[in-house]
Swiss-Prot record:
Gene: WOX6
Signal sequence extent: none
Coiled coil segments of this chain: none
DNA-binding feature ranges: 38-102
Family: Belongs to the WUS homeobox family.
Pfam families associated with the record: Homeodomain
Any one GO BP annotation for this protein: adventitious root development
Native source organism of the sequence: Oryza sativa subsp. indica (Rice)
Region feature (Disordered): 1-45
UniProt keyword Ribosomal protein, yes or no: no
Protein name: WUSCHEL-related homeobox 6
Any one of the GO CC terms: nucleus
Keywords from the UniProt entry: Developmental protein, DNA-binding, Homeobox, Nucleus, Transcription, Transcription regulation
Composition-biased stretches (Gly residues): 23-33
Cellular localization per UniProt: Nucleus
Lineage: Eukaryota, Viridiplantae, Streptophyta, Embryophyta, Tracheophyta
Length: 328
């Protein structure tokens, strides 16, 4: 039979039963496969079917129940013959490969951590000092730039220790801060602003850092990609503060800079499993991908286009789509 030669590490074995000695393929599916389904040769999924299966698996559905297996099988049948048992065994073998890779990564991480701890010259380094960022070139020696994550983007926090009370500057400073390291003037679409804001003003900005996340679909969308990717549609602001300058001559100076990014004119979607930046609004599908392709949503719905190859509906942020060849 076919079970003795299967291996979870091979992609082509995704639709065949896992290793079974003498198994005839009738009871190895735990009741998942159809009772009247005949024994067949090894199923080799097509590239389009692999992309759909991987997208569903990566979205969190690693062990679909019987009714969902039927829905997935109907979706895969658009690109070739497939049975319920093939879908069930593909997910079973895919879980085995995922667990094996996870064990290998954990072992490698443990070995690297052990090697790093044994070769460390000093054990007195505090976690805060170990996570400190590099000193920015061109700034005074006491100016340090820290990197932190806000709203899915890298923001920089600049702190300058200034014990001198004679510097009366409270607003505009000559220290240029570009949150994402934009070197050229005007490049990247960033605004530069400096203001002496209080702690309450900076805390008021915190609720708006994540912006209005576009919610397309919902719990009923079976194959929607997870929204936990940090993509937002509103501007991201990154506070960078320095010690304050009160009227007292003995305290330090504080300056806060806010580098805000203009709203992006593109959205991030997944096409054939690859994240891509696509423009908002109508898209010329024919000019972008060619004349003999169609765009299919991960749920199996075909996106309509007009006679000129323009999509008649806008793509949704974070959703997964597939480019397939137009049948001849």
């Amino acid at each position: 039979m076919e079970g003795s030669s299967n291996s979870p590490d091979r992609q082509s074995s995704g639709g065949s039963p896992p290793e079974e000695r003498g198994g005839g393929g009738s009871g190895g599916g735990g009741g998942r496969s159809a009772a009247g389904e005949p024994v067949r040769s090894r199923w080799t999924p097509k590239p389009e079917q692999i992309l759909i299966l991987e997208s569903i698996f990566n979205s969190g559905m690693v062990n679909p129940p019987k009714d969902e297996t039927v829905r997935i099988r109907k979706l895969l049948e658009r690109f070739g013959a497939v049975g319920d048992a093939n879908v069930f065994y593909w997910f079973q073998n895919r879980r085995s490969r995922s667990r094996r890779r996870q064990r290998q990564m954990q072992a490698a991480a443990a070995a690297a951590a052990a090697a790093a701890s044994s070769s460390s010259p000093s054990a007195n380094t505090s976690p805060a000092a170990a996570s400190a960022a590099t000193v920015q070139v061109g700034l005074p020696p006491v100016a340090v730039v820290h990197t932190m994550a806000m709203g899915g983007s890298a923001c920089q926090y600049e702190q300058q220790a200034s014990s001198s009370s004679s510097s009366g500057s409270t607003g505009g400073s000559s220290l240029g801060l570009f949150a994402h390291g934009a070197g050229a003037s005007g490049a990247g679409g960033y605004l530069q602003a400096s203001c002496g804001a209080s702690a309450s003003a900076s805390s008021a900005l915190a609720p708006g850092l994540m912006g209005d996340v576009v919610d397309s679909g919902g719990s009923d969308d079976l194959f929607a990609i997870s929204r936990q990717m940090g993509f937002v549609g509103s501007p991201r602001c990154s506070p960078a503060s320095s010690p304050a300058t009160p009227s007292s001559a003995a305290t330090a100076a504080q300056q806060q800079f806010y580098s805000c990014q203009l709203p992006a004119a593109t959205i991030t979607v997944f096409i054939n499993g690859v994240p891509m930046e696509m423009p908002r609004g109508p898209i010329d599908l024919r000019a972008m991908f060619g004349q003999d392709v169609m765009l299919v949503h991960s749920t199996g719905a075909l996106l309509p286009v007009n006679d000129y190859g323009i999509l008649m509906q806008s793509l949704q942020i974070g959703e997964s789509y597939f480019l397939v060849a137009r049948p001849t």
